[in-house]
């Protein structure tokens, strides 16, 4: 780059007529900013200077006010590129002589006698009776109309929604019922999905508690990371498949899933037993056979109109039948208690003590409060994992 030179020019900058006062193009003859070459370093001694007299003229061109190229610029040879502004006429174009090309005004509605001639047939008795129906009348006469063939202008105020439905004939389906039918299950699905995501976190929470028992006072660390497997430092509850502790983690999760399933089955069994849907015959001491057949001494037969038998019959060897009614609630629990009392005789000795302890209600409540105060913080980490199951248990308890 530089000023004037006697060497032949190459590439960009060979057109000396293109103004370049700032030296943006390489090897241009006008380069006062970036320095001239060694042959003629002075701007004043350049014999081929382009004084560019048009640069002093004030105008709006391609390069802004006061900077108008005299013979075209980067934007071309247009008048706007050279700074010459063309005035724009402010006179609007003449109106179109074709008046039929635009939007036509709405034509006046024809009289009722022309548009609906059947409405003028007043000699028909059946048609006259049909017009007494507001829905049929609304089809032929708008609001405020008469049967004389002329239509009265509609009032300026909006009519009630009932008049609209009366003029349209059959009522439109209530959209509120449709939307409620579609949107009603959405909160249920959202709550179910939330509970499902919370339930899926139960195995991980219980797994963390299980592994924490092996690291009392410290953070749980997987013991398989020091083996030959290239595993980084991680928790035993999130072992990768290449870690030797991955199999033990899966085994713990499987046992936890079985425990949760057993807990749900126990709750369902307790619920069915409370509702009286488990017709378990009580354990009758000294009986040889027990069946649910019809009994002579039982007021309600065992196989009657009820879904479940309401009494159990014992048939000793002498042929006489004895009926014992099934408890309407907690039949299975009473059966288990009787069975345990027969197998473990010392349980019957606890009955008076339990009855006496329950009778002392202040003592029971104080003992429960003391146990919750002492063991509550340590048990909360375990019980809190089962909180998502409580809404499911509550729904089953209410609707079954």
UniProtKB/Swiss-Prot annotation:
Residues 2-174 are annotated as: Pre-S. Pfam families: vMSA (PF00695). A lipid is attached at residue 2 (N-myristoyl glycine). GO terms for cellular component: membrane; viral envelope; virion membrane. Residues 2-119 are annotated as: Pre-S1. InterPro entries: HBV_HBSAG (IPR000349). Systematic vaccination of individuals at risk of exposure to the virus has been the main method of controlling the morbidity and mortality associated with hepatitis B. The first hepatitis B vaccine was manufactured by the purification and inactivation of HBsAg obtained from the plasma of chronic hepatitis B virus carriers. The vaccine is now produced by recombinant DNA techniques and expression of the S isoform in yeast cells. The pre-S region do not seem to induce strong enough antigenic response. GO terms for biological process: caveolin-mediated endocytosis of virus by host cell; fusion of virus membrane with host endosome membrane; virion attachment to host cell. Keywords: Acetylation, Caveolin-mediated endocytosis of virus by host, Fusion of virus membrane with host endosomal membrane, Fusion of virus membrane with host membrane, Glycoprotein, Host-virus interaction, Lipoprotein, Membrane, Myristate, Transmembrane, Transmembrane helix, Viral attachment to host cell, Viral envelope protein, Viral penetration into host cytoplasm, Virion, Virus endocytosis by host, Virus entry into host cell. Belongs to the orthohepadnavirus major surface antigen family. The large envelope protein is synthesized with the pre-S region at the cytosolic side of the endoplasmic reticulum and, hence will be within the virion after budding. Therefore the pre-S region is not N-glycosylated. Later a post-translational translocation of N-terminal pre-S and TM1 domains occur in about 50% of proteins at the virion surface. These molecules change their topology by an unknown mechanism, resulting in exposure of pre-S region at virion surface. This is Large envelope protein. The gene is S.
């Amino acid at each position: 780059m530089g000023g004037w030179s006697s060497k032949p020019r190459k590439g960009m900058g060979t057109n000396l007529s293109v103004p370049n006062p700032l030296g943006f193009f390489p090897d241009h003859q006008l380069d006062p900013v970036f320095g001239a070459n060694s042959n003629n370093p002075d701007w004043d001694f350049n014999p081929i200077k382009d004084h560019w007299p048009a640069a002093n003229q004030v105008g709006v061109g391609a390069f802004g006010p006061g900077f108008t190229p005299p013979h075209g610029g980067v934007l071309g040879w247009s008048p706007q590129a050279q700074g010459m502004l063309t005035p724009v006429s402010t006179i609007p174009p003449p109106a179109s002589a074709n008046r039929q090309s635009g939007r036509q005004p709405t034509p006046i509605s024809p009289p009722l006698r022309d548009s609906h001639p059947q409405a003028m047939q007043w000699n028909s008795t059946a048609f006259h009776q049909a017009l007494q129906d507001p829905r049929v009348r609304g089809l032929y006469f708008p609001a405020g109309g008469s049967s004389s063939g002329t239509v009265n202008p509609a009032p300026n105020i909006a009519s009630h929604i009932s008049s609209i439905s009366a003029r349209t004939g059959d009522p439109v389906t209530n959209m509120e019922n449709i939307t409620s039918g579609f949107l009603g299950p959405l909160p249920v699905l959202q709550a179910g999905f939330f509970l499902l995501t919370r339930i899926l976190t139960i195995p991980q929470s219980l797994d963390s508690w299980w592994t924490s028992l092996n690291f009392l006072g410290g953070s749980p660390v997987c013991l398989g990371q020091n083996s030959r497997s290239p595993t980084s430092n991680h928790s035993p509850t999130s072992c990768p498949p290449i870690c030797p502790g991955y199999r033990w983690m899966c085994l713990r999760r499987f046992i936890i899933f079985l425990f949760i399933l057993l807990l749900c089955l126990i709750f369902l069994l307790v619920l069915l037993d409370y509702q009286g849907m488990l017709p378990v015959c009580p354990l009758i001491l000294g009986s040889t056979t027990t069946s649910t057949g019809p009994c002579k001494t039982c007021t309600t037969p065992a196989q009657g109109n009820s879904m479940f038998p309401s009494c159990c019959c014992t048939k000793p060897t002498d042929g006489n039948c004895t009926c014992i009614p099934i408890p309407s609630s907690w039949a299975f629990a009473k059966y288990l208690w009787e069975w345990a009392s027969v197998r473990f005789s010392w349980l019957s000795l606890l009955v008076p003590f339990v009855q006496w302890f329950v009778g002392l209600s202040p003592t029971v409540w104080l003992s429960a409060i003391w146990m919750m105060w002492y063991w509550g913080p340590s048990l909360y980490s375990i019980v809190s994992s089962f909180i998502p199951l409580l809404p499911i248990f509550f729904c089953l308890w209410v609707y079954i």
